[in-house]
Amino acid sequence: MSDSTSSSPLNPISIVDSEYCVPDEIRFHIGRKCFDLDEYSFTVTDDSGKINWEIIMYNPLRGDNKFRVHDNEGKIIMTLQESNFEVFSRSSYAAYKGDSTEEKDFLFSVTRTWGLFWKCDLKGYLPSTKEEKGGFDFEVVAFWLNKDFVVKQKGGHVLVDGYFVGGNWIGGSSSFNVIVSSNVDYAFIVALAVMFFDSSIGSARVWKDHPDDIVSD
């Protein structure tokens, strides 16, 4: 991976599919649509109105731990599986092609570790990288007080800048904006953003023993 810190990579970075790499910078708005007993979901739109995705976890309080990413036509392009969720501790996610969680369809994984209370880190791993050897391919670094986060390659190359709008970190932000650099797989970035959002503000698993505490937007 490149060590450059410029905002646009020289070569397209395709993780999910090359069709999601475009020559122009894209601004996305990701908002929490629903959070109740039957559905935990997000909407994803861009400034041009050409992209209108839904990311849905069905029956979040009844054992489902998978977000499914639906494109404009409703096709499932990716499944995001959560495991080992622990509040203010360590959790992990894995992304797969389509409606699958099979090893042959594995795309990437992330782990979250809480260091300081006001900072959250996600380390990401591609199939060719072994986490146990101490390497990682990309990371998400976020600061609660600034309401922002950055996705970087290991060498420091910035792939995306994002910031939260509507609400606050600790109280539960309802939406955020993501600016994806040109030639960067935006499906990959959207998946990372939802993983980050879910792990940071508290997912459905946080409330599994306290359903009366859930507040829907």
PLM segments and residue spans:
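Low-complexity or membrane-interfacial segments used for flexible interactions
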Residues: 1-65, 72-75, 90, 101-217
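Short edge-strand/loop segments of extracellular domains
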Residues: 96-100
